[in-house]
């Protein structure tokens, strides 16, 4: 049974690709049609490929794998942090620092500095220092927290990386490839899918689309770690029943697209 229904994908605007002039021809197999200058993603394929991604992440989590969630674009930042945290995993939701994976030892020294600064604040060290020095240390801590807070407690290089918009996160993609770390990613119609191990064809610009798919990847981690989540299964079953009533075919989706521009912002 599908972990996400056609109805859920449609309501979140997952089917909206980019403008036809901004496409990557390698995404052609995942495109259903074109409407009003926008490519429409084939949601029947997306449903199946989300299932594959879900099972891939679930199996990795069941083997005690470390999953890193990555999404630094504005539309993804909140979802990436919230869902990774909910799943007990790790995230990068601001600028990816070059060498985060390939120069892990150096990154660890910066993380140690972050932890030291937190300890200094907690144990009262700051109270014994000049205000000007404390101000500088606080700024340093805030900067380190912003870029490294999501991986502060990551025990090792991740076993799987989930990425929102690999086109934007090219440095992360290259580092993962160099270290042979599998990449699961939301891939829009303007992106080269060849760089990704497990593809989820989808709109990667709409906040609702990003949140929906990111939350399902978090669900996969939770299920892998704790066993099958009955609530998730029951909700999926209910959603699929509802979907049969409202979305019978891709033609229904195309009809829904006509005149609907809500999910095409920033395209």
From Swiss-Prot:
Keywords from the UniProt entry: Ribonucleoprotein, Ribosomal protein
Ranges annotated as biased composition (Basic and acidic residues): 235-244
Keyword Nucleus recorded: no
PROSITE patterns cross-referenced by the UniProt entry: RIBOSOMAL_S2_1 (PS00962), RIBOSOMAL_S2_2 (PS00963)
Similarity comment: Belongs to the universal ribosomal protein uS2 family.
Chain spans, region Disordered: 224-244
MF annotations from Gene Ontology: structural constituent of ribosome
Name of this chain's protein: Small ribosomal subunit protein uS2
GO biological process, one term: translation
Family matches, as InterPro entries: Ribosomal_uS2, Ribosomal_uS2_bac/mit/plastid, Ribosomal_uS2_CS, Ribosomal_uS2_flav_dom_sf
Gene Ontology CC, one term: cytosolic small ribosomal subunit
Lineage, uppermost ranks: Bacteria, Bacillati, Bacillota, Bacilli, Lactobacillales
Keyword Ribonucleoprotein: yes
Gene from which the chain derives: rpsB
SUPFAM superfamilies: Ribosomal protein S2
